[in-house]
């Protein structure tokens, strides 16, 4: 049985290597390339990418699987040509982002479905996921673009915010929602998942929308607050905190936008 399992893993790796060609490349980021390989996708991380980050993404995904949410399951963590890689189930369909952009007249309907899906995710608990407030504090503490006084004020505000334990995606935006032919929506890419405050997760989603289109961001926030019975001001209290956390990802295209949010902090 053990030999058979090893043989099967070896066969999978050979298939992955054969399929890792430009024609199968789905997404290329600064630190990883994502390929379509038969019934799965394979994320291949650059050499030098922290091993702990790779295993953390796989572990996050596995823990969210255990909540009962229907998400793409982890199939394998392996090395390919000296680079760490994760194989995850492939979900057929279009991204909700593509559907929104090609059918703007139905934007509000798509956004309602999007918010319903986010609330479904946030209804779950996963006690072993990392705590959101701890992660946000680490990200803010590590920022070199902010002076010590600003970091202190942000951390003080973070500490004063309520601590919850809902499953939060951390990068919940329409590009991470796949819609199948039957209309079923699936959330992908759980690398940033934590347990924490749903309104903080909503604040991050709002910022991600606002980076592209302020009107769409405002529509999202209105629907989220209505459907979750949350005061808009409460979500807005998280905006400076999550803007600082997003700044830690060092995306130069977002830097000026995020700094403007951080600069308007009213202490």
Which residue stretches match the model-derived regions?
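Short beta-strand micro-motifs within the conserved protein kinase catalytic domain, predominantly
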Residues: 73-84
């Amino acid at each position: 049985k053990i030999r058979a399992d090893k043989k099967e893993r070896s066969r999978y790796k050979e298939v992955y290597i054969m399929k890792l060609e430009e024609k199968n490349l789905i997404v290329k980021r600064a630190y990883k390339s994502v390929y379509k390989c038969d019934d799965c996708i394979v994320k291949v991380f650059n050499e030098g990418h922290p091993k702990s980050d790779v295993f953390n993404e796989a572990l996050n995904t596995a823990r969210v699987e255990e909540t009962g949410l229907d998400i793409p399951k982890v199939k394998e963590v392996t090395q390919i040509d000296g680079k760490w890689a994760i194989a995850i189930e492939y979900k057929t369909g279009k991204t909700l982002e593509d559907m929104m952009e090609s059918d703007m007249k139905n934007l509000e309907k798509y956004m309602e479905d999007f918010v319903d899906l986010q609330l479904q995710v946030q209804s779950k608990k996963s006690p072993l996921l990392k705590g959101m407030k701890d992660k946000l504090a680490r990200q803010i503490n590590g920022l070199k673009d902010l002076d010590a006084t600003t970091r202190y004020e942000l951390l003080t505000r973070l500490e004063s915010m309520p601590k919850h334990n809902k499953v939060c995606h951390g990068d919940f935006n329409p590009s991470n929602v796949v819609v199948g032919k039957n209309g079923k929506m699936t959330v992908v890419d759980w690398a940033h998942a934590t347990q924490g405050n749903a309104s903080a997760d909503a604040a991050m989603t709002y910022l991600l929308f606002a980076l592209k289109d302020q009107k769409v961001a405002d529509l999202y926030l209105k629907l989220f607050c209505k459907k979750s019975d949350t005061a808009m001001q409460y979500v807005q209290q998280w905006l400076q905190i999550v803007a600082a956390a997003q700044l830690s990802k060092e995306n130069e295209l977002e830097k000026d936008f995020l700094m403007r949010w951080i600069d308007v902090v009213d202490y």
